Amino acid sequence: MFRTIANAWKTADLRKKMIFTLLIVLLYRIGANIPVPFVNITEALDTSGGNILTYFSMMTGSAFNYGTLFALGVTPYINSSIIIQLLGVAIPAIGRLEKEGEEGRKKIAAITRYLTIGLAVLQSVAYYFYIKNTNSDYLAPTEGTFAAVFEAIVIVICFTAGSALVMWLGEQINDRGIGNGISIILFAGIVSRIPTLIGSLWQYFTRGGVFYALSPIVLVCFLLMIAFIVWMDNAERRLPIQYAKRVVGRKMYGGQSTHMPIKVNMSGVLPIIFASSILSIPTTVQMFVNVEEGSFWEKFFNVFSSEHWPYAIIYFVLIIFFAYFYATIQYNPVEMANNLRKNNGAIPGIRPGKSTSDYIGKIINRVTLLGALLISVVALFPILFQLGTKAGGLDMQISMGGTSLIIVVGVALETVKQLESQMMMRHYKGFLD
């Protein structure tokens, strides 16, 4: 990976793109530290407990904890992209746009932008009320209804504008930089939390006792998880494909053997995001209602808190469910079998048509289960570790979870692959010139 980056840096055109991408990331990190008018959060907001605030904190690189200009980060854009992707299956009109080539993609991009702004407004309003309910001292004091309404409007506009600006920065990377813009910004936000992770591990290490032994173990486990995610991201099941020979005029076409790759982790981090979002709803509701100690509702809400064991079980089941749900959206065995037949291709030993589609469907189900189990292991490890240490009376908190690691490693690998393809393209171009 480092050799690829070093070789890309030697190419003038790629070097300009890499510098441009780094400058955009720098602008994003500056914006993530710019305060919003009327907001003065002196202490980081508590985003532990497995509620939706944990998700926002992870996605924004802790900018959410301090109410800065980019407090919402790329979250509205990611949520709107997921919604549009799901609507593409439910609404035929959107599904047709996805198949209309460049024009269709432009229309979908425009719809995604409008939906992003709408979600940003809603999330900004919710964030404002959360800050107000958490500690009224975090907002500038106001006198009268007009001043309070004006303050709320300014704060909501700033958070919404910050989210729109983050989306624009991501699109600039897409057009003039390297990698997927939104993914790069998300990567930068998560990586910015690494010093906090190292600092907390060092504090545990210096406390001595059992923490002296646990801290290096945690660090080694994280390194092993990174290696495991790299392997998982590149793992694929290859279905052999044989194309029949056909004669057109005096030329013979086909006859070659190839394969159809099916990625083990075909859904990426989406099942984890979906599962986290669903589980965050009850605990988010709990923040806005008064629950009596020892009541039924307190026990009910505790089930959905990451500080309790039932959360891990429900989380695991939801990840499996959403992995299958996403695989159903992404892969259509009948369509894949029809495309093979149209191109005179077949899987050796399998009859074309329904037998082929059934076979492909069976393979996809098996691969999906394996991939879902693997990402569940990565996502649940930090949660189970914290629950285990808490049960032992240690309560060792980890500031970076498995979701963050999957995103960081996935974005890094994808960016390196794009660099390699850009270098290959320029190599062939120079050869032809």
Task: Name each model-derived stretch.
Residues 1-98, 103-433:
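N-terminal cationic and glycine-rich segments that engage phosphates or anionic surfaces
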